[in-house]
């Protein structure tokens, strides 16, 4: 059984190398592309103007971002065995601040998102004993958003 798994692993690893060599990386859209492609802001602005509930959500996000600007960046403070609450605060802040920057072009939001990412990157760890904490602490979501 071990031999079969080893052979399968060798075969699969060889195939992925071939696929990677054949992939045309020039066809990938430029950044930003993760959640909101370049120019996507205009479609959101139009939807906000046409759909009042969406305008309410947008306004609430902007209010939260403005409030975040007055608060200190997140700190590594565990609750019992968990860092999950802090992870979720960081994720929410980075996501919302990135959105605010893209929608307004105001660099204060981008700078603050960067501060939040730097703050979590300085944590001694992301609580690897609880994988959900680590998963929630994905700061790449803010990168080039």
PLM features per residue range, with description:
Residues 4-13:
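Sec-dependent N-terminal signal peptides
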Residues 10-11, 26, 95:
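N-terminal hydrophobic alpha-helix used for membrane targeting or insertion
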Residues 12-15, 78:
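Intrinsically disordered, low-complexity segments enriched in small/polar residues
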Residues 18-20:
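Boundary at the C-terminal end of the N-terminal hydrophobic targeting segment
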Residues 22-30:
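N-terminal low-complexity, Pro/Thr/Ser-rich intrinsically disordered segments
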Residues 33-49, 53-145:
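Aromatic-lined, polymer-binding surfaces characteristic
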């Amino acid at each position: 059984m071990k031999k079969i798994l080893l052979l399968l692993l060798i075969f699969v690893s060889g195939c992925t190398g071939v696929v990677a060599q054949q992939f045309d990386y020039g066809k990938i859209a430029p950044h930003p592309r993760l959640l909101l492609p370049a120019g996507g802001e205009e479609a959101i602005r139009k939807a906000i103007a046409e759909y009042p509930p969406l305008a309410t959500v947008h306004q609430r996000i902007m209010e939260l971002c403005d409030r975040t600007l007055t608060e200190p960046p997140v700190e590594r403070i565990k609750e019992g065995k968990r860092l999950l609450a802090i992870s979720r605060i960081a994720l929410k802040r980075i996501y919302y601040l990135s959105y605010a920057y893209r929608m307004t072009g105001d660099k204060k939001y981008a700078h603050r998102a960067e501060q939040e990412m730097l703050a979590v990157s300085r944590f001694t760890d992301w609580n690897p004993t609880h994988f959900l904490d680590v998963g929630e602490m994905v700061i790449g979501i803010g990168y080039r958003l």
